[in-house]
């Protein structure tokens, strides 16, 4: 499936395969929002104001004493973070696990046949990567991350303790977990 930016449909440089890599420029420019809106009319995207409010609320809940912030990556953020980070560490979060519980009408599915992708859901544990963002760049980098992860509001950003390979907590990071009350949350039975 290919999406084209509706503001310039004849420009081949504006075309992106939905399975193609996300870039900082694509996120910063708002082109991703426009392409998704064009491909899936009626899919509710979060407004810039809603994303900014969500980011402010998340930062207001930041655990004290932190210089900068960690972000927990468990999927594509591991190999294509699109954000500048000062440090990268293997990390585990307790109380959350990867689950095919996020319905998507793009990328892995269509509006007629939505696909399922992984999201963090309650219970168990999850191994991934922690990315440390430095304080001077925190606002810009998290704004970019919110444009990516909070596109539809399917996630809730939560602060989670990050554990190293020995099980010791080395900080708290933002993890994007499925919103169980959201319309994109799907819980399949064992048979499915």
Residue ranges and their predicted role:
Residues 2-192:
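A glycine-rich, hydrophobic/aromatic-adjacent loop/helix-cap motif
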């Amino acid at each position: 499936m290919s999406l084209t930016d509706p503001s310039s449909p004849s420009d081949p440089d504006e075309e992106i395969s939905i399975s193609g890599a996300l870039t900082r420029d694509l996120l910063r420019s708002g082109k991703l929002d426009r392409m998704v809106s064009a491909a899936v009319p009626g899919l509710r995207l979060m407004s810039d104001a809603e994303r900014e409010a969500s980011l402010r609320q998340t930062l207001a809940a930041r655990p004290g004493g932190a210089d900068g912030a960690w972000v927990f990556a468990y999927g594509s953020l591991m190999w294509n973070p699109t954000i500048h980070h000062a440090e990268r560490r293997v990390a585990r979060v307790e109380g959350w696990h990867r689950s095919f519980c996020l319905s998507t009408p793009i990328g892995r599915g269509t509006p007629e046949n939505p696909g399922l992708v992984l999201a963090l859901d309650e219970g168990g544990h999850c191994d991934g990567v922690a990315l440390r963002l430095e304080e001077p760049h925190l606002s810009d980098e998290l704004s970019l991350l919110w444009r990516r992860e909070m596109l539809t509001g399917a996630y809730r950003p939560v602060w989670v303790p990050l554990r190293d390979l020995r099980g010791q907590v080395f900080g708290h990071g933002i993890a994007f977990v499925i919103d169980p009350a959201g319309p994109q949350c799907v819980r399949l039975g064992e048979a499915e």
